[in-house]
UniProtKB/Swiss-Prot annotation:
Chief subcellular location: nucleus
Keyword presence, Nucleotide-binding: no
Compositionally biased tracts (Gly residues): 9-20
Keyword Nucleus: yes
Subunit text: Homodimer.
Record's subcellular location: Nucleus
Taxonomic superkingdom: Eukaryota
Annotated transmembrane regions: none
GO molecular-function terms, A-Z: cis-regulatory region sequence-specific DNA binding; DNA-binding transcription factor activity; protein dimerization activity
Protein name: Transcription factor bHLH80
Length: 259
């Protein structure tokens, strides 16, 4: 980092970090700003200045005796032109110090005839803070914050509704019993299922035969009643057979020749 300052007398103190002193009182220092300040303090002690002497007063006093500063580097020429414009504004040579914001400093300093930036081609009556241009970062940030909060609320609302719907669907699925689809008749593959199907088929065939043999059996809707009706019919048949057998034993038939 390169920085420049004007020494207080004809011979300045030795600068830190490889400083060079020119005849015009310009000191070139290639070091940190802290080293530059320490060098200024050392020069103040050597020249017997007051302890509370400010940097601005040093620069102001040196401006009255220094004259125009020239340098080979473009950056030094830029700084010298700025310093000349600043120090030549007041005839007394006092540096205009402000304890307010930089905006007030610029507005107060531009009230002169030439202004602090007359060397750069900027007129003194230039309106730095135009009323037509709306530069309110607080308002812009407030608008952005409200827009972001509204978008966030919309996302939360949509996310909350979808989350509630998902929870309700999960609850419905948990409460519901899974539906078991029954296999088609004749399409069972398990051995027990096949055996059960065969048994039911055989029972159905036998009941159908009993319905053909036993009268009024088809009027019954229950299988147990059908079987009871069949049992009663069989008992009746047995009693008839027994009666016929007894009658045959008691019967005595004569041959036709004897008649």
């Amino acid at each position: 980092m390169q920085s420049t300052h004007i020494s207080g007398g004809s011979s300045g103190g030795g600068g830190g970090g490889g400083g060079e002193v020119s005849r015009s009182g310009l000191s070139r220092i290639r070091s940190a700003p802290a080293t530059w300040i320490e060098t200024l303090l050392e020069e103040d002690e050597e020249e017997g200045l007051k302890p509370n002497l400010c940097l601005t007063e040093l620069l102001t006093g040196n401006n009255n005796s220094g004259g125009v500063i020239t340098s080979r580097d473009d950056s030094f020429e830029f700084l010298s032109s700025v310093e000349q414009g600043l120090y030549n504004h007041h005839q007394g040579g006092g540096f205009h110090r402000q304890n307010s914001s930089p905006a007030d400093f610029l507005s107060g300093s531009g009230s002169g005839t030439d202004g602090y930036f007359s060397n750069f081609g900027i007129p003194a009556n230039y309106d730095y803070l135009s009323t037509n241009v709306d530069i309110s970062p607080t308002k812009r940030s407030r608008d952005m914050e409200t827009q972001f909060s509204s978008q966030l609320k919309e996302e939360q609302m949509s996310g909350g509704i979808s989350g509630m719907m998902d929870m309700n669907m999960d609850k419905i699925f948990e409460d519901s019993v899974p539906c078991r689809v029954r296999a088609k008749r004749g399409c069972a593959t398990h051995p027990r299922s096949i055996a059960e199907r065969v048994r039911r088929t055989r029972i159905s065939d036998r009941i159908r035969r009993l319905q053909e043999l036993v009268p009024n059996m088809d009027k019954q809707t229950n299988t147990a009643d059908m079987l009871e009706e069949a049992v009663e019919y069989v008992k009746a048949l047995q009693s008839q057979i027994q009666e016929l057998t007894e009658q045959q034993k008691r019967c005595k038939c004569k041959p036709k020749e004897e008649q």
